Curated annotation (Swiss-Prot):
Zn(2+) binds at residues 20, 23, 35, 38. One of its GO terms (cellular component) is cytosolic large ribosomal subunit. Coiled coil: none annotated. This is Large ribosomal subunit protein eL37. It comes from Thermoplasma volcanium (strain ATCC 51530 / DSM 4299 / JCM 9571 / NBRC 15438 / GSS1).
Length: 54
């Protein structure tokens, strides 16, 4: 018997995010090919009203 899935240990040693070309933040997801900060490669920059300071 083992605790949990053995495959999950193989996922941990890879990079999930790298530096984004557009915004420069370390938020570009390598697997989904999308930046969680600016939304690259979408043509419009990602911005939400709830994310801005009041």
């Amino acid at each position: 018997m083992s605790n949990g899935t053995a495959v999950m240990g193989k996922i941990n040693n890879k990079k999930t995010h790298i530096t984004c070309r557009r915004c420069g933040h370390h938020t570009y997801n390598v697997r989904t090919k999308r930046c969680s900060h600016c939304g690259f490669p979408a043509p419009r920059i990602r911005s939400y009203k709830w994310a801005k300071a009041k």
